Structures are given as structure tokens and as C-alpha cells.
Amino acid sequence: EDYDVGGDMEWKRPSDPKFYITWATGKTFRVGDELEFDFAAGMHDVAVVTKDAFDNCKKENPISHMTTPPVKIMLNTTGPQYYICTVGDHCRVGQKLSINVVGAGGAGGGATPGA
């Protein structure tokens, strides 16, 4: 499945610091899914970071850093994944996303496929 991060709001500085937490709630991210971060070039970016960098909005030495929209990230490993915007105070005001990726056939929240 392909996910447009933030839906209609896309990837930008949110007015609600919990916006991206709320957006991700209830979604099951699986290996093989793709995240797409849409944003205005030069206004935002996407950095893949560690949990410590995510929790503390550390911008230095990200795992990877993409600045040209749209940024498409294929989910190819299970476990937690962390993304932030490194521009200004954007991460500190909530422009950050953490997800947990499950295996392609893994159960996500007990939902039955096709139910």
C-alpha cells in the first residue's frame, strides 16, 4: 500500500503537535508499503533518524536525508522507523513521524484481511 504522509495536509509544520501521531494511528505499515512525503521544495525535508534523534529532534548525522520532493521511501525492514523535518523548529513543533513496520504477512492489530 502507498501512504501519502499527512494526507491532505502533506508534510509540513503542523498546527497541532500531535498531527502526525494521529495520522499514523490505526494504520498498519507493512514491508513493501511506500511512504510518500509531499512538501514545498526548500521549505521542508525528510531525514531518516534514530529513536534518540527523533525523541530529541537531533538534526546531525541522520541515517539519510532527502531534500527534493516528493520523497518516496519503500518500507523494506520490520520494526520502528523514524522521520523528521530538519528545517528550523519544525521537528520540535511536531513535524516528525514514527511508525512500526510489520512483515508483509504479519498481523497488524488483529484485523482480519477482507473483513
Swiss-Prot record:
Glycosylated at Asn-76. The carbohydrate content was determined to be 1.2%, corresponding to one hexose sugar per molecule. Binds 1 copper ion per subunit. GO terms for molecular function: electron transfer activity; metal ion binding. The keyword Disulfide bond applies. Residues 1-103 form the Phytocyanin domain. The modification Hydroxyproline is found at residue 113. Changing residue 48 to I: In 25% of the molecules. SUPFAM superfamilies: Cupredoxins (SSF49503). Its cofactor is Cu cation. PANTHER family: BLUE COPPER PROTEIN. Probable electron transfer copper protein that serves as a direct electron donor. Does not show any activity towards ascorbic acid, p-phenylenediamine and several common 'classical' substrates for copper proteins. This is Umecyanin. It comes from Armoracia rusticana (Horseradish).
